[in-house]
Amino acid sequence: MNQDAAGNTIPGVAESWETTDNKTFIFHLRKNAKWSNGDPVTAEDFVYSFKRAVDPATASPYSWYLEMTTMENAADIIAGKKDKETLGVKALDANTLEIKLESAVPYFVKMMGHTTVKPVHRATVEKWGDQWTKPDHFVGNGAYVLDKWVVNERMELKRNPNYWDNEHTVINKVTYLPIENQVAEMNRFLSGEIQITNELPLEHFKRLQKEHPESVQVQGNLCTYYYGFNNQKAPFNDVRIRKALSYAIDRNIITDAILGQGQKPAYFLTPEITAGFHPEMPAYGR
């Protein structure tokens, strides 16, 4: 699945799907979906990839995500209690994928837009092992494929002519530059060396917004910043203390006076810009 600019779920490799109980989902894959080497993208590719993601031998840092979906047996497989072959995923045919959950999850289709559930090319992974992501080996099924990768210097992507929606791809090449220093990144942007940056030094933000209003745009970021504390120990094991602390924090001072880059006060863990999320503001936030 993919997401549009507003965060709404839209078809990706799966052109349609259905469920009657929010526990068993059937996804119908596009017959014209291909890997960058020309191989067809099949339901079996997803079966292999999901099993690989939960396999303890893979040690995926995002295996928890499949557990969060409640995919059948995912939790036990990750914990080493069951074999990966028991995962609730099955290829009904080359273009039909069945996924079974342990609990009804109405938003499951939305969860299928996460990077963790994107398929990997089995033949490439099995041939090259931990070297499968090298530019000379990599095979993907997205709009771009990895062309060059110099660690800590640059990553270059080129257009994938075999992508199922290639006719709507408008950029032929994308280069990512890993720049740790925000001031250096800002200067390279101002000099025209890079076209897009999503970070600006806090102390320069207001000046740049005034001097380059056409370039500096503030858009919502789907994340939440929060203070964490141990609620298993006193005094934070008392819900009244936790509420008092929340009431005492002036979120507007933090967002407007300290950060001042368009952040909004948060009264929910889920960002307000999340598609379909329409919360009622708590009394202390009004």
Task: Label each PLM-derived region with a short phrase.
Residues 72-75, 80, 86, 94-95, ...:
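Gly/Pro-rich hinge or "lid" segments in bacterial periplasmic/extracellular proteins
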Residues 1, 5, 22, 30, ...:
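Sec-exported extracytoplasmic/periplasmic mature domains
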Residues 1-21, 51, 137-140:
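N-terminal lobe/hinge region of extracytoplasmic solute-binding protein
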Residues 18-36, 102, 110-112, 220-233, ...:
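Periplasmic solute-binding protein
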Residues 15-65, 98, 188, 235:
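Aromatic- and charge-enriched surface segment that lines or borders ligand/interaction sites
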